[in-house]
C-alpha cells in the first residue's frame, strides 16, 4: 500500500483557519500557528459571550426598572412582588421599555403594584 501524504489535507486546514483569521492584525492573520490560537480564542469568546449577553441584558433591564420604580417611590423587589400579586405577567424586557419610553403607563403599573401591596 502506498504511503498517504497529508499535504492536501494540511493545506486545506491551514487555508480554512487563515480565512477565519482574515482581518486580524499582524502575524495573527499570516502565520498558521498564531492564527490558529487567535481563531480558537475568538470562537471561545463568541461562544461564552452569546450566553453572557442574555445575563447582561437582564441586568440592564432590572437596573432601568429599579431606577424608574424608585422615582415613583417604590423599590424594585416590592414592585415585582406587587405585580405578581396583581397577576400582571409583563416580562422585564417590556417593563424596562415602558420605563424608558412611556413613563405614564409605567407609573400606572407602579400604582397598581402599590395598591396590591397595601
UniProtKB/Swiss-Prot annotation:
GO terms (BP aspect): ribosomal large subunit assembly; translation
Q: Does the keyword Ribosomal protein apply?
A: yes
Recorded GO CC terms: ribonucleoprotein complex; ribosome
Which molecular-function annotation in GO is an example for this chain? rRNA binding
Q: Does the keyword RNA-binding apply?
A: yes
Entry keywords, A to Z: Ribonucleoprotein, Ribosomal protein, RNA-binding, rRNA-binding
| Annotated function | Binds directly to 23S ribosomal RNA and is necessary for the in vitro assembly process of the 50S ribosomal subunit. It is not involved in the protein synthesizing functions of that subunit.
Assigned protein family: Belongs to the bacterial ribosomal protein bL20 family.
Kindly provide the name given to this protein in its UniProt entry. Answer: Large ribosomal subunit protein bL20
Which organism does this sequence originate in?
Desulforamulus reducens (strain ATCC BAA-1160 / DSM 100696 / MI-1) (Desulfotomaculum reducens)
Amino acid at each position: 500500500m502506498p504511503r498517504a501524504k497529508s499535504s492536501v489535507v494540511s493545506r486545506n486546514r491551514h487555508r480554512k483557519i487563515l480565512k477565519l483569521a482574515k482581518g486580524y492584525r499582524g502575524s495573527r492573520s499570516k502565520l498558521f500557528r498564531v492564527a490558529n490560537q487567535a481563531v480558537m480564542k475568538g470562537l471561545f469568546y463568541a461562544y461564552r459571550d452569546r450566553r453572557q449577553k442574555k445575563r447582561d441584558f437582564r441586568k440592564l433591564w432590572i437596573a432601568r426598572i429599579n431606577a424608574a420604580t424608585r422615582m415613583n417611590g417604590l423599590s424594585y423587589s416590592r414592585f415585582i412582588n406587587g405585580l405578581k400579586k396583581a397577576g400582571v405577567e409583563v416580562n422585564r424586557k417590556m417593563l424596562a421599555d415602558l420605563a424608558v419610553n412611556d413613563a405614564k403607563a409605567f407609573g400606572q403599573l407602579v400604582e397598581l403594584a402599590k395598591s396590591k401591596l397595601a
